[in-house]
Amino acid sequence: MKTIGLIGGMSWESTTSYYQIINETIKKELGGLHSAKILLYSVDFVEIEHYQAVGDWEKSGQLLADIAQRLEQAGADFIVICTNTMHKVAPQIQKKITIPILHIAQATAQALLVDGIQKVGLLGTKYTMTQDFYKEKLIESGLEVLIPDQVGITEVNRIIYDELCLGNIKESSKQTYLAVIDDLKKAGAEAVILGCTEIGLLVKQFDTDLPLYDTTVIHAEKAAEWGVNK
């Protein structure tokens, strides 16, 4: 079994989901008392959020690259960045290590294509929805990507940082998300990517008839697969 290097804490709530899903998947795959071999480095999220807010991606990338190096030195066989947004600096991190990074957007694209999805809506932080680092991975895989209008982008992003990252789950915010999802459906989306590891804490598949692809679940299950097979 491979040792999984997790970079978590962005936020810690979603990182606990990674730990649980990876171990549940390993147990299902191998049975018995098997559990995942995991090294976890959990950051102080306030540092990362500050660098995001001021646009200092170089600094945040260096911080995570240093962590990835420590995980590699400690015996990790591959790296899992437990957040969508910070995959913006994945290339910078990869340059500093010799082990692979399991990219969350590539794992998600594979899951969509297996299910025959061609046009997909994307929800996430404003960085994930509007910048190319994430959407390009989806487009390169042959997917057409739709995002909310500017009002939707602002509200989706606000709820992530002001509520979900603080562990606050509000019914009013769920309804806001469901309205945005409905707009994406009307625009032709065949499914929606929950492209922030916190969104799955708020919106569940039973809340809508449009297929939802929770990147936390997809990424964590793929990490378990790599841990067993790669």
What do the PLM-derived regions correspond to, one by one?
Residues 1-230:
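Non-catalytic structural scaffold of enzyme domains
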